[in-house]
């Protein structure tokens, strides 16, 4: 058996880091088990689904390093779902209902007032052909509900009916089908809700494992019943915890908040996003994995907590810095060249500045300092100006190397009596225009004698 998983986003908005958690969990599970990863767009909601969102999802996944083995669109598979609908109708497991939303709400309130569970009472099953014809004469069209197998002989005498599965994350799980309403699978306009196409596709595409958020736990009991009604064995399920904002709110892809695209545009490294999406809310230490291979080694569904995890953007900043500070030049070289940072100075430059970067693009700022004209620098005090004039007069002759800074500052210290911050800060400001930054021993060599002299006060 080939392990086959799927990530099934609805292209009604941009994916956020919470969706990324699901996508990466499936991708890494497939990688660890020599399996296949299917990207399936759940685009049966024709009104809200957009191709632009589907394309954006593909771009986001590619940026993260997720490469689907197969791509499917549910909107192109309606004929397959139609056959499943007919099979369920023939088996007497799909029945027509004509209630309006208002009528259903009134019934729900009435059941609550009678201290009954607010589940659908299967009134549609009681309709005669004449009653159905009368509704349709009024212009009503039926929606279709799946008859849950929560009774022995009489569908109006429901019995506790437990569905069990061994969840990859949560362990043994049980749901009672008697506590649920028969789910609507087909809308009045003939379009399909999520549940049926999802099951049909999982059967048709050979999905062996379903890994998704724990907001689907209850759905799983219903879907297992539909799998069995269609004569198929249900896949293995795993339900990971959900990510929330710091304030505990759910993440919404339609708001664009924390979307993968916005994180990419903000300059975060893909492995920073992937590391946090996978490791947060687990027993693993949240630290940056340099590549997917190392993240896969740390990925373990059994380590995921059963409570929700709060996404803190500050953690993403920390991981991003850690990745940049350890990134080898071989990995950074092409990206640096694309920003105009190349030549023999590029590698020593990268080694010098990477430890001070929050974002990769910040390297451009430091390149302009070592290889360009310095922007305006703070005017030194008169005392510092005199000090700098004396210091620049003591610059060692070329050629310079990494000992030049030490030789120079020791000479300046001996001549001026300054030491510590009083010595180093005026020199840093004069050379870089910045109060903080990479080691000046590294920068001085990169700036070079000629450019250094232009920064003399």
UniProtKB/Swiss-Prot annotation:
Residue window of motif 'HIGH' region: 9-19
Residues that, per the record, bind ATP: 253
Annotated gene: gltX2
Organism: Brucella anthropi (strain ATCC 49188 / DSM 6882 / CCUG 24695 / JCM 21032 / LMG 3331 / NBRC 15819 / NCTC 12168 / Alc 37) (Ochrobactrum anthropi)
EC number annotated for this UniProt entry: 6.1.1.17
Official protein name in the record: Glutamate--tRNA ligase 2
Similarity-based family: Belongs to the class-I aminoacyl-tRNA synthetase family. Glutamate--tRNA ligase type 1 subfamily.
Molecular function (Gene Ontology), one example: glutamate-tRNA ligase activity
One annotated Gene Ontology cellular component of this protein: cytoplasm
Assembly and binders: Monomer.
Role description: Catalyzes the attachment of glutamate to tRNA(Glu) in a two-step reaction: glutamate is first activated by ATP to form Glu-AMP and then transferred to the acceptor end of tRNA(Glu).
Localization of this protein: Cytoplasm
Catalysed transformations (reactions): tRNA(Glu) + L-glutamate + ATP = L-glutamyl-tRNA(Glu) + AMP + diphosphate
SUPFAM superfamilies: An anticodon-binding domain of class I aminoacyl-tRNA synthetases, Nucleotidylyl transferase
